[in-house]
């Protein structure tokens, strides 16, 4: 499933892998994870993603937030506070996010 440009979700049983190859943060913020692939509960057990900000790298994770009857995904760079670096359009995500669903 293509979630955004340069962002693909793959499912193998209960294992979900989201691959990023230079996905722009703003595009990822607009993406929707299919309901059958939501983490249950909304906790991601593994992460291995990198946010590229100019020449700097920031490890980070993906956060799911409810928005009506869907979940919207946000990239949160190396912090518990999503506002620290924001989800600006020039930021790009590289790597993979892996998690399990119930």
PLM regions: where:
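Short, well-ordered beta-strand segments enriched in hydrophobic/aromatic residues
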Residues: 15-22
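Extracellular jelly-roll beta-sandwich "head" domains, especially the C-terminal globular C1q domain
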Residues: 3-6, 25-35, 44-102
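Terminal (often C-terminal
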Residues: 1-13
């Amino acid at each position: 499933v293509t979630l955004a440009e340069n962002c693909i979700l793959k499912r193998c049983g209960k294992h979900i892998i989201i691959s990023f190859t230079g996905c722009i943060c703003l595009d990822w913020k607009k993406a929707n994870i299919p309901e059958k692939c939501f983490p249950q509960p909304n906790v991601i057990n593994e992460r291995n993603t990198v946010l590229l900000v100019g020449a700097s790298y920031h490890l980070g994770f993906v956060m799911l937030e409810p928005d009506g009857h869907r979940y919207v995904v946000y990239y949160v760079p190396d912090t518990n506070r999503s506002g620290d670096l924001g989800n600006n359009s020039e930021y790009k995500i590289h790597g993979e996010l892996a998690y399990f669903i119930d």
